[in-house]
């Protein structure tokens, strides 16, 4: 008789654990209430800052981000080469963390309504005992080019070692899948 409530409780706990493992956490969302986001038609995505161990990870994550943003068809994303040309011609010293003045100059040069910057904080494999899994932690900022003001910002973390990884082993999802899910969670907050 007592087994039925315990079984039901364990099933509910299992489902809750599965759902929490399958979704990316989006935290620290800022949205400027005065900004008309409908006025943003063209965006430039500058190189992301990289705080992870792998030196090429920022470009990989930026590529996934640009592809996902293009697939929404919500805005026109300037080609990477055009953005790089603008950064070089304007002599922007730190393209991954531009000053408000740099954003205004770059926006005018590229005819972009906004500039997107990003930071990859963690990327790769994490280990706990004999269990490994992939993780990504990143943040994105949308900067309006008329003033150089941040009008939207959010962070996303996806992956890591779950209860199920510890219980059954395994390496979690492939790193590209984890990256896509983290970026998609950010897109839902930005576009949705």
Model-derived regions: residue spans:
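Bacterial N-terminal signal peptides that target proteins for export
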Residues: 1-12
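Bacterial N-terminal signal peptides
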Residues: 10-20
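C-terminal/domain-edge helix-coil "capping" segments
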Residues: 22-41, 106-110, 132-135, 143-192
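N-terminal segment of the mature soluble domain
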Residues: 40-47, 52-119, 149, 153, ...
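Short glycine/proline-enriched turns and hinge-like loops at secondary-structure junctions
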Residues: 57-58, 130-133
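Charged helix-capping and loop-helix junction motifs
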Residues: 98-100, 134-137
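Generic short beta-strand segments
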Residues: 119-124, 157
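Extracytoplasmic/secreted cell-surface and envelope-processing proteins
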Residues: 125-129
């Amino acid at each position: 008789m007592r087994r039925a409530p315990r079984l039901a409780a364990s099933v509910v706990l299992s489902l809750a654990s599965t759902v929490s493992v399958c979704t990316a956490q989006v935290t620290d969302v800022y949205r400027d209430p005065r900004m008309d986001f409908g006025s943003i038609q063209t965006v430039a995505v500058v190189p992301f800052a990289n705080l992870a161990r792998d030196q090429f990870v920022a470009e990989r994550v930026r590529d996934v981000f640009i592809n996902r943003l293009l697939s929404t068809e919500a805005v026109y994303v300037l080609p990477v080469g055009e953005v790089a040309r603008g950064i070089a011609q304007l002599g922007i010293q730190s393209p991954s963390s531009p000053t408000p003045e740099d954003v205004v100059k770059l926006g005018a040069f590229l005819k972009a309504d906004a500039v997107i910057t990003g930071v990859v904080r963690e990327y790769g494999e994490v280990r706990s005992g004999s269990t490994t899994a992939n993780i990504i932690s990143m943040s994105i900022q949308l900067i309006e080019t008329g003033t150089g003001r941040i009008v939207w910002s959010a962070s996303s973390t996806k992956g890591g070692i779950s209860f199920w990884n510890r219980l059954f082993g395994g390496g979690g999802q492939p790193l590209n899948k984890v990256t896509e899910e983290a970026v998609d969670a950010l897109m839902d907050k930005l576009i949705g």
